[in-house]
């Protein structure tokens, strides 16, 4: 057996049930790996004592033979999920010292499934970013490096800590959230698997809100099978979230046959962007050929409103963020600015929010407030909502024609260097989401799967987009792609 922390969820689960290892051993192996990987800055709140306590409880359950799905499996939790009594800061100064009195539904579902939380993972502040450079905790460093180059690279964002931790084998899997690509883009940058389920599949209750009509939690794992196992544990109806779907959760793992013969895979012409790197185009063509070889039927499709997706997203998401983030005022919890004598409530709000929010969050709050203002509401926000409806209708039309899944690149490039894009126009950074935002706007499930390595030895990802509520079929298509790619590369340990 490989090192315990290098196992995936499925292998570790089988080893636990066969009595070949214990949750305590798995957890200790991960805690050691986390200690050795401090330079990656992936974990920001450590819960070693809690993890060992839960591991002991899991071992007791396993000994009785009544173990739930993820019993004894050590995972990381993105800092956006509220965890009872454990710091939950959303990567922001404004939530300094916040210890929730409650557990998010998704993290509670994982606890109920027997998972062992190792700690909280770094992320872009309030999930706003594509490179994990907006975090109050500092940058996360991608465990992958370019050939013969020691320059630190981004793991992507906003779930950069989750992606880096899974890629570096610091945990068996991790939770992420995806508002415009924040699970799929980091997964593509780190050679891991990340699925954003259909909007409403996982409860949003207890997850710090960015854009409520777009946010969705999902797993980041080492394989498609692991994603199926963890997504099932995370999912389920929650009466505390009005957008949570009252639907039965399928056995996602049982759907993984790898047989996609006769399935129709759509290839959208609008995703062939001007200036798309040759390596991304070649990766896409390879993916198409693999799907064909597996027996799928390839169909050219059109999603005509794709070019408006990014502008619409960057109106809707900041608008919802400006509304959601209005609650951080320094009154009830989190950071409160020191006030000068004579300062009133208005000065307290101003100073607290100026000190508590980083520049990217401030930028998006300003944009959001602007597009919601009386003079611009119709010109920007309402127009963006109409575009969103058209984007959704594009997908509905394609799926009505019998298309089962859509194959696209996950990102327009491999991981870039830290600092490379922070000095550029913010729009250049936003372009990282070009292949992923449509999926959030339409509320569809999307999964990123490793597709190979670029010339510099960095991972590149392919994205599959599925029909709403058909994650089981999407995971099976992704499983077939994963089998065809045969991606086994791991980052060389330098940390």
From Swiss-Prot:
GO terms for molecular function: ATP binding; glutaminyl-tRNA synthase (glutamine-hydrolyzing) activity. It catalyses: L-glutamyl-tRNA(Gln) + L-glutamine + ATP + H2O = L-glutaminyl-tRNA(Gln) + L-glutamate + ADP + phosphate + H(+). Belongs to the amidase family. GatA subfamily. The keyword Ribosomal protein does not apply. GO terms for cellular component: glutamyl-tRNA(Gln) amidotransferase complex. Heterotrimer of A, B and C subunits. Transmembrane segments: none annotated. Its EC number is 6.3.5.7. GO terms for biological process: translation. Keywords: ATP-binding, Ligase, Nucleotide-binding, Protein biosynthesis. Gene3D superfamilies: Amidase signature (AS) domain. This is Glutamyl-tRNA(Gln) amidotransferase subunit A.
């Amino acid at each position: 057996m490989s090192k315990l922390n290098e196992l995936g969820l499925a292998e570790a689960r089988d080893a636990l049930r066969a009595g070949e290892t214990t949750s305590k051993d798995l957890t200790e192996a991960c805690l050691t790996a986390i200690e050795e990987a401090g330079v990656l800055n992936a974990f920001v709140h450590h819960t070693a004592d809690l993890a060992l306590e839960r591991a002991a409880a899991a071992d007791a359950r396993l000994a009785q033979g009544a173990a739930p799905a993820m019993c004894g499996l050590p995972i990381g939790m993105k800092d956006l999920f509220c965890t009872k009594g454990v710091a939950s800061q959303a990567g922001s100064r404004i939530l300094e010292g916040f210890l929730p009195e409650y557990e998010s539904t998704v993290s509670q579902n994982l606890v109920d499934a027997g998972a062992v939380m190792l700690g909280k993972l770094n992320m872009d502040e309030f999930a706003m970013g594509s490179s994990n450079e907006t975090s109050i905790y500092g940058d996360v460093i991608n465990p992958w490096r370019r050939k013969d180059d020691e320059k630190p690279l981004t793991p992507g964002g906003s779930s950069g800590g989750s992606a880096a931790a899974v890629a570096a084998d610091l945990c068996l899997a991790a939770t992420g959230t995806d508002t415009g690509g924040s699970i799929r883009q980091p997964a593509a940058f780190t050679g891991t698997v990340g699925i954003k389920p259909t909007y409403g599949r996982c409860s949003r209750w207890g997850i710090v809100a960015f854009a409520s009509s777009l946010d969705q939690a999902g797993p980041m794992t080492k394989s498609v099978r692991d994603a199926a196992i963890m997504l099932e544990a995370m999912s389920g109806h929650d009466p505390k979230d009005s957008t949570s779907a009252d639907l039965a959760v399928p056995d996602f793992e049982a759907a993984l046959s790898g047989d996609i013969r006769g399935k129709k895979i759509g290839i959208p012409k609008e995703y062939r962007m001007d200036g798309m790197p040759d390596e991304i185009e070649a990766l896409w063509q390879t993916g198409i050929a693999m799907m064909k070889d597996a027996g799928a039927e390839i169909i050219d499709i059109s999603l005509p409103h794709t070019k408006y997706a990014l502008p619409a997203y960057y109106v809707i998401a900041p608008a919802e963020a400006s509304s959601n983030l209005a609650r951080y005022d320094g009154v009830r919890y989190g950071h409160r600015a020191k006030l000068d004598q004579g300062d009133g409530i208005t000065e307290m709000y101003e100073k607290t929010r100026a000190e508590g929010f980083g520049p990217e969050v401030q930028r998006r709050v300003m944009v959001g407030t602007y597009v919601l203002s009386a003079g611009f509401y119709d010109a920007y926000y309402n127009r963006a909502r109409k575009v969103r409806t058209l984007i959704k209708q594009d997908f509905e039309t394609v799926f009505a024609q019998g298309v089962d899944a859509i194959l696209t690149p996950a990102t327009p490039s491999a991981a870039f260097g830290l600092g490379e894009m922070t000095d550029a126009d913010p729009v250049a950074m936003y372009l990282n989401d070009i292949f992923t935002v449509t999926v959030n706007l339409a509320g569809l499930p999307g999964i990123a799967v490793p597709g190979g390595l670029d010339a510099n030895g960095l991972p590149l990802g392919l994205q599959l987009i599925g029909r709403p509520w058909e994650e089981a079929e999407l995971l099976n298509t992704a499983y077939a792609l994963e089998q065809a790619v045969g991606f086994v590369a791991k980052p060389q340990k330098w940390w």
